Amino acid sequence: MINKFKFYLIFLKLILILVNCQNSLNDYGFGIVDESSICTSYIGDELCKNRLSNSESIYTTPGGGGGGGIDKLSQISTLPILQKGFQSLTFSQGICKDLNFIEFGMCDSALSPCIETTPKITPGYNISLPQRVCKSVCERMLIGCPQLAIQIDCSISFLFPKIGTFYNLTKYGYTANGGMYMVPCIDTEINYEKNKVQENVGFLESCPYPLLLKNSTDPQYAEKRGYTYLTPTNCVLPCPIPNYTKRQMDSVINMSKAMSSISFVLSLFNVITFGLLIKKKSKYNVCIALMAIGSSFIYLSDIINYGVGIEKQLCPEPGRVATQRVDSLCGFTGSIFHIGITLCVLWSMTMGIVLYSKIKQFKLPNFRYFLIGNLSFTVVTLIILASAKKFQGGNGFLECWMRDRWYVVAIFWIPCGIALLLGVLSICGVIFEIYKISKNVSLKDSKVVIRELKPFVLVVTVSASLIYLFVFYFDSESKYDFYKKGVEDYILCLLTSENPLDECYTVGPNFNSYFMFYFLIRFFGILFFGIFGTSEIARNAWTESFFVTKIKSKISITTVSSSTRGGGGDTSGIKSSSSSSNSGVCNNNNSTRKNYGDDFNSKNLSQPDNTIITNNNNNDNNNKMEIELDSIDI
């Protein structure tokens, strides 16, 4: 019985010994010997400088460097992987802790310290062996940043031994311990505590290309100077922001260049025609001239931008958008653009009100109030924006303008939204009145309605375009959080993509909507010219202008002189013809004057609404009833 009891005790001891041996073996890793590996110094990259436990001896795989030199391929190929890891940590600052220590651990893991055996250990051989990071270091890294567990498994004893790693060196003459040579693991915490104090080594941020690393605490790189920081990092978005492909952006820029240039010339034509050549100034002509001036200012800002160079103007430095605080030209073009877009909105509203008042035949306040009000609003808002230095280029925008959300809403969209509403209500009233009028107009008199449709089409088109811009802006603002989430996806793409410039884009408004936004703004000048610059009024203004009259006079004198010298005969016929021609011009002028309002002011204003145009076969009576907006005197 006693012998049996002793047997059980001995058996239990054997089991405990085996368990302890197994536990002891679990504290070690087993490595593979690579005869081609050597111990070399660190190549000196800033990424792991002062973060390595032994920068003088790094486990390195040599390449085929010529001239007897050592090509440290393993270090060179490891650094991009380490950089990706540092970039991931940079964007984990709001989630992870102890990031500085994690960087130390990552450097020691990827660029392992190296131990070289002596001839005493391996006679005739110099074997280089890596010194792996201790398991405790790995566990501390995961405690600081649990999301690293996706990529790091601390249970792999080959990479993270608790005590050390065994290497079988029997082949190289090592006989002790059964030929198993043990290399102790490296405790990164010792190096971390030393270098953190002595070398003042802090957390190193790294930004994936094309993001740029700037110091947000440095006034030179402050956000108000045009840098867009991806908090909580010091990485800034590139400029211009990559919402769309290069091909798409080139199409928008090329369209804008072509249409802005054409619209600028055509807008100037309308300014000269309706602002200078037409001598009888009416409310209607003034509205056209001031809208044309507004559109000219818009396109002038474009021409300046493209003359300087759109990217140089809007992105004067890598990662920085132009701001009024730093770039005076941005403030200048922003002011021009603001004047232009504001005038277009306000005079579009005014023209709608003028149209409706003419159709309904009610008296408006003195037109000078519209002039003073519209121009005062434009100047006052410009002064506010310029004094607050709110003009700047925007990521994804093609011009300098105000970008502060509250300024944009309070100074532009709310008042101009009200103006648009008044214009739309006026247009709705005009539509209804034209519908009533058109029912009472015969087919042969339909030119009366068609003539009145021209200003109507302009105001409708401009108002619809401005409403589209209004909707586009607030739709984009309402999706701000969605676009912000898109930046996170963009960063993730940058961290994982091999070709980020061609594969990674931020999220912005739909490209077709974005293209239409800029197309409509740059189409105003062409639209104005198509409706008014080609009209009979414009043609007559140029025909009767001083320059054309002078040219005609010279041609006429030359013709008469030539005839006199050639024939020497009776010139009475010529004189008679000339007199008749002049008489015809006078008659035409009288007729034109009659059609543009002399008759209207005396007779039409007394007519009730339902008799503005009647279905009468008498053409003279119809002419008296025509709605000619050019007769609305200021």
UniProtKB/Swiss-Prot annotation:
Signal peptide positions (record): 1-21
Protein encoded by which gene: fslD
Ranges facing Cytoplasmic side: 279-287, 357-368, 432-454, 535-634
Family: Belongs to the G-protein coupled receptor Fz/Smo family.
Annotated Gene3D superfamilies: Rhodopsin 7-helix transmembrane proteins
Stated name of the protein: Frizzled and smoothened-like protein D
GO annotations of cellular component type: membrane
Glycosylation sites: N126, N168, N215, N243, N254
Transmembrane in keyword set: yes
Transmembrane intervals: 258-278, 288-308, 336-356, 369-389, 411-431, 455-475, 514-534
Record keyword Cell cycle present: no
InterPro entries named among the record's database cross-references: GPCR_Fz/Smo-like
Residue numbers on the Extracellular membrane side: 22-257, 309-335, 390-410, 476-513
Compositional bias annotation for Low complexity: 572-592, 609-622
Localisation: Membrane
Region ranges (Disordered): 560-624
Lineage, top ranks: Eukaryota, Amoebozoa, Evosea, Eumycetozoa, Dictyostelia
Record keywords, A-Z: Coiled coil, Glycoprotein, Membrane, Receptor, Signal, Transmembrane, Transmembrane helix
Its membrane topology: Multi-pass membrane protein
Major site of localization recorded for this protein: membrane
Domain FZ: 34-178
